[in-house]
Amino acid sequence: MQKASRKNKKERGVSIKVKTSVHNLSKTQQTKLTVGRLGLGLIIIQHGPYLQITHLIRKGAAANDGKLQPGDVLISVGYANVLGYTLREFLQLLQHITVGTVLQIKVYRDFINIPEEWLEIYDLIPEAKFPVTSTPKKMELAKDESFTSSDDNENVDLDRRLQYYRYPWSTAHHPARRPISISRDWHGYKKKNHTISVGKDIDCDVMIHRDDKKEVKAPSPYWIMVKQDNETSSSSTSSTSDAFWLEDCAQVEEGKAQPVSKFG
């Protein structure tokens, strides 16, 4: 009987020690988060067989709640036990959760430390600093203002360059007119009604000088025709007489012409 009682006492002591050790390892925290535009607002890595929180996204659901901390290990999300989950499996689980859903999150606190390489690259994670309030909008506004100011300056320069090419009238005070073609505007000339007198007199605008003694005649085209006819046809006498007759008629017409003529 005494031996049995001793064994029971030893077993009780051992069982008590195991419970205390498990209690120290399984210090848990739980909270409820509402899925928002940024999800749960957590940056999670796979640390061995566990999913561990490394960073909280600013203005995210977890950061606003304030109960979860970097280093916590996920136990369950909603009704799903995620111990042993990979990141891919956890992502597939979150894909079926819609915005506005309230999830109960349970984690281990002070269970394992975050790897040093993840602590060193905190500044390199853009999600940990997202979203920064009003700075992106201010930057966009500043960019827009710079673009608009540069555009305005360009427009002013263009206005200065083009002001000499604008029409002198405005459409508000003058009726619509058909635009003038550049070739006509630049190369066209205006005809003016002006009478020019041509003749041998000194009073004429254009005076013709002739030497009555030696009258130079231009070579008659009929001589060429006569030569061609002589080479090609046998009736050379008739063609020659016709050519001389035509040339005589031309000389008679020149004698009848007036010495002064006017052109409008």
Swiss-Prot record:
Signal peptide region: none
Domain of life: Eukaryota
Family matches, as Pfam families: PDZ
Disulfide bonds: none
PROSITE patterns per the UniProt record, alphabetical: PDZ
Domain PDZ: 22-109
Coiled-coil segments on the chain, per record: none
Annotated protein name in UniProt: PDZ domain-containing protein 9
Species annotation: Macaca fascicularis (Crab-eating macaque)
